[in-house]
A protein has these predicted regions:
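Solvent-exposed beta-strand/loop surfaces of large extracellular or lumenal domains
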Residues: 233-252, 362-397
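Catalytic-domain carbohydrate-binding cleft regions of carbohydrate-active enzymes
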Residues: 1-254, 259-260
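Short conserved micro-motifs at the rims of enzyme active sites and ligand-binding pockets
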Residues: 57-58, 106-110, 131-132, 221-223, ...
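Edge strands and adjacent loops of beta-rich recognition modules
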Residues: 268-339
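Short, well-structured beta-strand segments within conserved domains
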Residues: 328-330, 361, 404-415
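Surface-exposed beta-strand/loop patches in extracellular or lumenal glycoproteins
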Residues: 217-226, 338-357
Length: 420
């Protein structure tokens, strides 16, 4: 519901007679009536006018972003969206978005806006919700802005699709705790004073650092890395020490991103829409911790559309990877959640990024068959009896395919050859 113009360029001198708490009461009423008529369906409604507590009933967005008289000059408005979205998260409104492309202004020259459009899409892919929207009948489909812009927009959108298992796990955390997915740096690193001056970058969950380019013509980005070791997510074998500012390359096809050493990132295949496939292989990217430490992630899943998640109908799959002097010990924990089960069989895929290539792999003490990448990927969505691994020294990855039976398994990747 749109209660008035709200693009930061003009505000009415007199209010229209509605209070913000009137809006939240309206959204509460709409949610209750929807659920009354659809007792096992989730409601989705969105507003920019509400009151404290709106997260119980609706989602927010930042209002109409004004591009100005010339839409190609909307860089400042795009940059402003990051601190606004972060502020919303701090206000316990974890699910928010902005008008990706900037709402206001006619687009008369699509090629002239291609760079700005690309950066909008790249930044918007890391909104908790992503929504491309422009006023009137102005079309903003990616292919209108030229072949390069379309290609770059497609890559950003597909990246978000791949990250949906990661995002959905953090959506559950937001539901339980109020912690937002899109986080100011200081929320994760409150003791580091430098993080309080980083309003052009943010944490996406606890593992990923995202620094979108928001300046016209920029092909690099000044990024602050807090404590720890950070791996360039666009070049996953390049690592940097933390507690430093650095300038990273950011051509038009690149979103500056870093993953913290000691992280596990679950991913799904790219799809045309989120539930195109009811069950699919989940890939866990593993960036091992330093020797003697371990990496953990607990994947959250539920049916996605009904209210079963409120009744305990969900499951978690805990994954742990310990780094030892002998190699890596991967533990797939027992799947928890008796009230929800997968709608079909699937494989779990693991990709460990390592320069120390294991020579032997054991599953629960028994040697695993070694194969090549092609064989490992073959029929992974239809064949659920194959357990195999593939060390790839050239790519610096150690790959594993494991049928998901919901049980605990210990996989040892050993740096030396052993005979069993």
């Amino acid at each position: 519901l749109d209660y008035g113009k709200d693009d930061g360029e003009w505000l009415p001198n007199e209010k229209g007679g509605n209070e913000n708490y009137d809006a939240i009461n309206l959204f509460r009423h709409m949610k209750e009536q929807f659920e009354k008529r659809n007792p096992n369906r989730r409601v989705f409604q969105m507003t920019r006018a509400a009151f404290a507590g709106l997260q119980r009933y609706t989602f927010g967005w930042t209002g109409d972003c004004g591009n100005g008289d010339d839409v190609t000059q909307g860089w400042g408005q795009m940059a402003n969206q990051i601190p606004v979205l972060l502020s919303a998260g701090l206000g316990i409104i974890p699910f928010t978005t902005c008008d990706i492309t900037g709402y206001c202004g006619d687009i008369e020259d699509y090629p002239a806006m291609a760079e700005l459009y690309t950066r909008w899409i790249q930044m918007g892919a890391f909104n908790p919700l992503s929504r491309i929207h422009h006023e009137g009948n102005v079309a903003v489909e990616p292919w209108l802005f030229g072949e390069e812009a379309e290609k770059n927009a497609k890559a950003a959108i597909e990246l978000k699709y791949r990250l949906l298992p990661y995002i959905y796990t953090y959506a559950r955390e937001a539901h339980e705790t109020g912690l937002p997915l899109m986080r100011p740096m200081f929320l994760e690193y409150p003791a580091d004073m430098e993080t309080f001056s980083t309003d052009a970058q943010f944490m996406f969950g606890s593992e990923l650092l995202v620094a979108p380019v928001v300046k016209k013509g920029a092909r690099n980005k000044n990024v602050y890395l807090p404590e720890g070791t950070w791996i360039d997510y666009n070049n996953k074998h390049t690592a940097y020490s933390g507690e430093q500012w650095m300038t990273v390359d950011a051509p038009l096809n690149t979103i500056p991103m870093f993953v913290k050493q000691g992280s596990i990132i679950p991913q799904m295949p790219v799809m045309n829409y989120t539930d195109e496939k009811p069950v699919y292989p989940v890939t866990f990217e593993i960036f091992p911790a330093a020797a003697g430490s371990e990496t953990t992630f607990s994947l959250y899943e539920d049916a996605g559309t009904d209210l079963g998640y409120l009744r305990g109908e969900f499951m978690r799959t805990p994954i742990t990877c310990q780094t030892t002097d002998k190699g890596y010990t991967l533990k797939v924990g027992t799947r928890t959640g008796e009230k929800y089960s997968l709608p079909g069989q699937r494989n779990l895929m693991f990709c460990i990024y390592t320069e120390q290539m294991p020579k032997t792999a054991l599953l629960d003490g028994q040697k695993i068959k070694k194969t090549n990448v092609g064989k490992l990927e073959e029929n992974r969505e239809t064949e659920f009896t194959i357990t195999a691994w593939c060390p790839d020294k050239k790519l610096g990855t150690c790959l594993l395919r494991l049928p998901d039976d919901g049980k605990e398994h210990i996989i040892e990747f050993i740096l030396s050859l052993i005979h069993i």
